[in-house]
Amino acid sequence: MSQVQSPLTATNSGLAVNNNTMNSQMPNRSNVRLVNGTLPPSLHVSSNLNHNTGNSSASYSGSQSRDDSTIVGLHYKIGKKIGEGSFGVLFEGTNMINGLPVAIKFEPRKTEAPQLKDEYRTYKILAGTPGIPQEYYFGQEGLHNILVIDLLGPSLEDLFDWCGRRFSVKTVVQVAVQMITLIEDLHAHDLIYRDIKPDNFLIGRPGQPDANKVHLIDFGMAKQYRDPKTKQHIPYREKKSLSGTARYMSINTHLGREQSRRDDMEAMGHVFFYFLRGQLPWQGLKAPNNKQKYEKIGEKKRLTNVYDLAQGLPIQFGRYLEIVRNLSFEETPDYEGYRMLLLSVLDDLGETADGQYDWMKLNGGRGWDLSINKKPNLHGYGHPNPPNEKSKRHRSKNHQYSSPDHHHHYNQQQQQQQAQAQAQAQAQAKVQQQQLQQAQAQQQANRYQLQPDDSHYDEEREASKLDPTSYEAYQQQTQQKYAQQQQKQMQQKSKQFANTGANGQTNKYPYNAQPTANDEQNAKNAAQDRNSNKSSKGFFSKLGCC
């Protein structure tokens, strides 16, 4: 699921922010600049829609039997698939009681790192917080965990793409102010986010009061940084594994240090510069593997001066990043000071935070439109392909040749190269066609081997005609994957059984090729057996049976 927010700016005075004056309570926001005596509509967070379900608590019990398999949680009807990611699959849905749209997240129950249950708990903690979607249901349906929450609009990343991968300073300032407020509210609930990125900030749905309000979603990485009752901060640690998105994560996170509130604030600073510049200096770095790539990104961040990053931009953005990078591990960020610092940018430009954003100017002033900006992504609302960088490159240097001889020679070379490339392509296509035909023949043979009844083949052929965005198609894919996993496990078990000797021990090697243990190995094995016997006797003696 995906989303959006509004930015803020600051003055060239390099406004100093005293981080020591902040306490752990929410700061007073009365100093935020007002338009005509009121906060701009875009800076208000509207309350979540009431779905009138009677009880919004999630159900942990298994699904009840129903005639309609497209209904989950008793009254949420599954619509089309609108997104897919590492967590699972996202569907559009409808609350059948009141007809309001919802988002339904599916996560395989046997996934290695399940997140939906933790995410549901976080939504419960944040219930009623402005800019946080309301949760309606959590439970198990078949092979999946399911979470039902508010359906929102596109993400800031989507809008960034639609706007040509560059936001105006005014838009960035207004978005930044909203982002800071959202993270402040999260921190006030004793949580840190740990995965700040544009994809996780969404705007509302069109036609709603919060259509341009920024929301925060996807709390799978969120973590408590202090005890909710005692307010005792977690201890500082090092050698921690990386959590978050490398492009935006803080320098301390790259260094393996425990994350706290300061890391969320620094990651937001990187997002602000991403919106202003179009890309960050540490994007596109190459490395043999991810570990080395993350190290190179972290090193580039350390070596890049914040004011070099802000060159040609309002200096307040560089000042913000400098301040938050100097926060101590347990220090409370000065959220209000940061908002005022960034809003001062608008004062310098003679602008106001009036709730006007770049994406509102799209399509002749009609704003973003899914019928035009249409390419499904993780959040369901898509963005067009990024600008083609190759198209911006200059033409080949061969155009500098002006004489006919040069042109003729160049054209001959080009024709020869094209002919060679065409011949190679035809040869490759022929090989691929042969391989495809062989694979299809083998698949057909396997199908009739496993399912000699023609009716099964007809059902499979009919099922393949399903709409790929439908829930039925997703169910079919899930069942096929599950069947393949089961078949794989059975094959592994059969192989293991075939290699098992009479004493039940697995013969890892062919009988004639069994390795012989030397004296040192025999002594080591004997010692292990003695220790095992001692431990087992000790266990049973506690039960009084030995």
Swiss-Prot record:
Outcome of swapping C546S: Impaired palmitoylation and plasma membrane localization
Bias type Polar residues, positions: 1-33, 44-55, 497-530
Enzyme Commission number, as recorded: 2.7.11.1
Catalytic activity as recorded in UniProt: L-seryl-[protein] + ATP = O-phospho-L-seryl-[protein] + ADP + H(+); L-threonyl-[protein] + ATP = O-phospho-L-threonyl-[protein] + ADP + H(+)
GO biological process: cell morphogenesis; endocytosis; glucose mediated signaling pathway; response to glucose; signal transduction
Span of domain Protein kinase: 76-360
Lipid attachment points (S-palmitoyl cysteine): C545, C546
Keywords linked to the UniProt accession: Acetylation, ATP-binding, Cell membrane, Isopeptide bond, Kinase, Lipoprotein, Membrane, Nucleotide-binding, Palmitate, Phosphoprotein, Serine/threonine-protein kinase, Transferase, Ubl conjugation
Residues bearing PTM N-acetylserine: S2
Cross-link Glycyl lysine isopeptide (Lys-Gly) (interchain with G-Cter in ubiquitin) placement: K465
SMART domains xrefs: S_TKc
Residues modified to Phosphoserine: S455
Post-translational modifications reported in the UniProt record: Palmitoylated by AKR1, which is required for proper plasma membrane localization of YCK2.
Lineage top rank: taxon: Eukaryota
Binding residues annotated for ATP, in chain numbering: I82, G83, E84, G85, S86, F87, G88, V89, L90, K105
Record field: compositional bias (Basic and acidic residues): 453-465
Entry GO terms, CC: cell periphery; cellular bud neck; cytoplasm; mating projection; nucleus; plasma membrane
Region (Disordered) location: 1-67, 373-425, 443-546
Sequence ranges of Low complexity compositional bias: 412-425, 475-496, 533-546
PANTHER family: CASEIN KINASE-RELATED
Family, similarity comment: Belongs to the protein kinase superfamily. CK1 Ser/Thr protein kinase family. Casein kinase I subfamily.
Role: Casein kinases are operationally defined by their preferential utilization of acidic proteins such as caseins as substrates.
Protein name: Casein kinase I homolog 2
Organism: Saccharomyces cerevisiae (strain ATCC 204508 / S288c)
